[in-house]
């Protein structure tokens, strides 16, 4: 049942998701494409986690955070992709109010966690390159755990702000969401609350997270660049660049799409463009991250070669 009478209002108990397209042929094609992307994402990120766990040479803070980033990428994609794949095969794509709440919270939680982890990894690179003699002290196991716990707490608090924005919304009629998942912006557009006040907590917290994490990343890489330019050894420069370029590529891809969604004025792009960009950072980027880190990082490539050689000759 999609509606429930409540006094003078008709409460919505489920939502209908528009998805990406109504074309039945295109839906089958997209199902195959996104299924392949999801399988590559899960296998690639789980392989990254396993490689870091079994390779003693990767037991460093940078790869400790990278393994958690890989876990987040699997979780990020899994909040959206399975439901999206099912919807491609259904004539009418629905999600319950509770399911929508869970998807909204989960997406905000892992998305925020990714921001904090990327910022933490930038700080780790800053300490490693700019203060190498203090690295073992400033990035001790205890400090790494504290940074990780802080990231999870930050993710939980920001996701909670999304619920504070979502729960006051009244849905008294239409229940068709112009999106492939439960995203806050189209839900607010669908609401009959008639006020922009509910979106304030989520907007404020999201802006705070983006400003803080981008500032940490920008300041860290400014000092890193200055330090690298002062290096006299060409080999030292190349090693420093090799450990930073993969992370910087991941940061650029992720924050580029997040900025498009949350910073650019809504009037500058359509809802369909919003959906395409959202697919990129929730589905495509999590698949690309393990590829970026394996292709651009010499330590990852070296560890992978050693593990493969060990398997072949064992």
Swiss-Prot record:
Disulfide bridge positions per record: 100-192
GO MF term list: G protein-coupled receptor activity; olfactory receptor activity
Gene3D superfamilies on file: Rhodopsin 7-helix transmembrane proteins
Positions of transmembrane segments: 29-49, 58-78, 103-123, 137-157, 200-220, 241-261, 275-295
Key word Disulfide bond present: yes
Membrane topology, Extracellular segments: 1-28, 79-102, 158-199, 262-274
Gene Ontology CC: one annotated term: membrane
Pfam families: 7tm_4 (PF13853)
Domain of life where this protein originates: Eukaryota
Cytoplasmic topological domain residue ranges: 50-57, 124-136, 221-240, 296-314
Keyword terms of this UniProt record: Cell membrane, Disulfide bond, G-protein coupled receptor, Glycoprotein, Membrane, Olfaction, Receptor, Sensory transduction, Transducer, Transmembrane, Transmembrane helix
Gene Ontology terms describing biological process: G protein-coupled receptor signaling pathway; sensory perception of smell
Record SUPFAM superfamilies: Family A G protein-coupled receptor-like
Subcellular location: Cell membrane
Glycosylation sites: 8
Entry membrane topology: Multi-pass membrane protein
Annotated family: Belongs to the G-protein coupled receptor 1 family.
Role summary: Potential odorant receptor.
Protein name: Olfactory receptor 5P51
Species assigned in the record: Mus musculus (Mouse)
Gene assigned in the entry: Or5p51
